Amino acid sequence: MGQKVHPHGLRVGVIKGWDAKWYANKKDFADNLVEDNQIRKFVKKELFSAGISKIEIERAAKRVKLNIYTAKPGVVIGKGGSGIESLKKKLTNYISGKNILINIVEVKSVEAEAQLMAENIAAQLEKRISFRRAMKQTMQRAMRHGIKGVKTSCSGRLGGAEIARTEHYHEGTIPLQTLRADIDYGFAEANTTYGKIGVKVWVYKGEVLPTKKVEKEEANA
């Protein structure tokens, strides 16, 4: 089942954390969940040019904190913090009666972030660049940044073909069923003249958890 399940969801509680860090009772849970979804969609659309790889949402009683992971923090912050203030004002349409805090986290290795890689391939497909060339170039750039493996997939009417199909390419290793393997996953859609093309990217960055046996041996030594 490691082939089918979302790599992040499979590893939550093992080596990955939640992107929504809050607790709510039954009465408020659904409202908060819908609000989170609206916030993510809006921020992604508003700051698409900034290369947003992930948005974490933390909630307290009357406070909502957004941790925005971006490749271009300057674009989000703006001159003298004007970008953040503008974003806060627009977010009041989705978050009412709560104090909004925004924390910007810079993504260091853009070429090794699965979500940004998927969006990059999708953008190239929209510019009518060959899907094979877009996938292979993106993978080669990622491998040069010291990752262990990368796999890409494009689904749809590739090259304007009559029948939709899926093509995969991979370099290195992608141990999807190994829970201690740090696998990043990204998905994007390209709107072409022939219809939508789905782009998926898996990036293997190495193992996270050491074996418990080794830890015990070191403790006893």
Swiss-Prot record:
Annotated ranges, domain KH type-2: 39-108
Keywords, sorted A to Z: Ribonucleoprotein, Ribosomal protein, RNA-binding, rRNA-binding
Record's keyword annotation contains rRNA-binding: yes
Protein origin, superkingdom: Bacteria
InterPro entries assigned: KH_dom (IPR004087), KH_dom-like_a/b (IPR015946), KH_dom_type_2 (IPR004044), KH_sf_prok-type (IPR009019), Ribosomal_S3_C_sf (IPR036419), Ribosomal_uS3_bac-typ (IPR005704), Ribosomal_uS3_C (IPR001351), Ribosomal_uS3_CS (IPR018280)
Signal peptide: none
Classification via Gene3D superfamilies: 3.30.300.20, Ribosomal protein S3, C-terminal domain
Assembly and interaction partners: Part of the 30S ribosomal subunit. Forms a tight complex with proteins S10 and S14.
GO cellular component annotations of the record: cytosolic small ribosomal subunit
Keyword Oxidoreductase: no
SMART domains documented for this protein: KH (SM00322)
Protein name according to UniProt: Small ribosomal subunit protein uS3
Role played: Binds the lower part of the 30S subunit head. Binds mRNA in the 70S ribosome, positioning it for translation.
PANTHER family (alphabetical): 30S/40S RIBOSOMAL PROTEIN S3 (PTHR11760), SMALL RIBOSOMAL SUBUNIT PROTEIN US3C (PTHR11760:SF19)
GO biological process: translation
GO MF: mRNA binding; rRNA binding; structural constituent of ribosome
Family as reported in the entry's similarity comment: Belongs to the universal ribosomal protein uS3 family.
